Amino acid sequence: MVHLTTLLCKAYRGGHLTIRLALGGCTNRPFYRIVAAHNKCPRDGRFVEQLGSYDPLPNSHGEKLVALNLDRIRHWIGCGAHLSKPMEKLLGLAGFFPLHPMMITNAERLRRKLAREVLLASQKTDAEATDAEATET
């Protein structure tokens, strides 16, 4: 268990610690720091510790980069820190937690939508092929 120092307790004044994303970067180029911060502090304000980073824009290889200090995340969760919803989803994708239920639901919806589009495209090409054969004869 972590003991909060008196200096930290004075600035704390109730609430709880939250592991969340702090926005950085510039216009049209977001970059997030994964931080442990008090829930009363502003989103981009003071934080207790930086636990990683997240770059949501794909790089030249189509990858979204995430750096996590899983030992420190495990430590803060053990100390009673709460997770924000985006962090729950991100840690689920990283394999640290089970996948968030909405991630599974959205993946199923997307899979069904893509299957429907492929089926419609194949039916359209079959119809065009039969029309082309009918006009040739």
Swiss-Prot record:
Which InterPro entries does the UniProt entry name for this protein?
Answer: Ribosomal_bS16, Ribosomal_bS16_dom_sf
Carrying Phosphothreonine, the residues are 130
Per UniProt, what is one Pfam family of this protein? Ribosomal_S16
Indicate the principal place this protein occupies in or around the cell: mitochondrion
- Which species? Pongo abelii (Sumatran orangutan)
Q: Does the keyword Cell division apply?
A: no
Q: Where does this protein reside within or beyond the cell?
A: Mitochondrion
Query: What is the name listed in the Swiss-Prot or TrEMBL entry for this protein?
Result: Small ribosomal subunit protein bS16m
Q: Which GO terms describe its molecular function?
A: structural constituent of ribosome
Q: What UniProt keywords are attached to this protein's entry? A: Mitochondrion, Phosphoprotein, Ribonucleoprotein, Ribosomal protein, Transit peptide
Q: Output the Gene Ontology cellular-component terms.
A: mitochondrial small ribosomal subunit
Q: Which Gene3D superfamilies match?
A: 3.30.1320.10
Q: Does the record carry Transit peptide as a key word?
A: yes
- Single Gene Ontology BP annotation: mitochondrial translation
Family named by the database record: Belongs to the bacterial ribosomal protein bS16 family.
> What interactions and quaternary structure are annotated?
Component of the mitochondrial ribosome small subunit (28S) which comprises a 12S rRNA and about 30 distinct proteins.
Give first and last residue of the transit peptide.
1-34
Q: Which PANTHER family match?
A: 30S RIBOSOMAL PROTEIN S16 (PTHR12919), SMALL RIBOSOMAL SUBUNIT PROTEIN BS16M (PTHR12919:SF20)
SUPFAM superfamilies, sorted: Ribosomal protein S16
* Upper classification of the organism: Eukaryota, Metazoa, Chordata, Craniata, Vertebrata
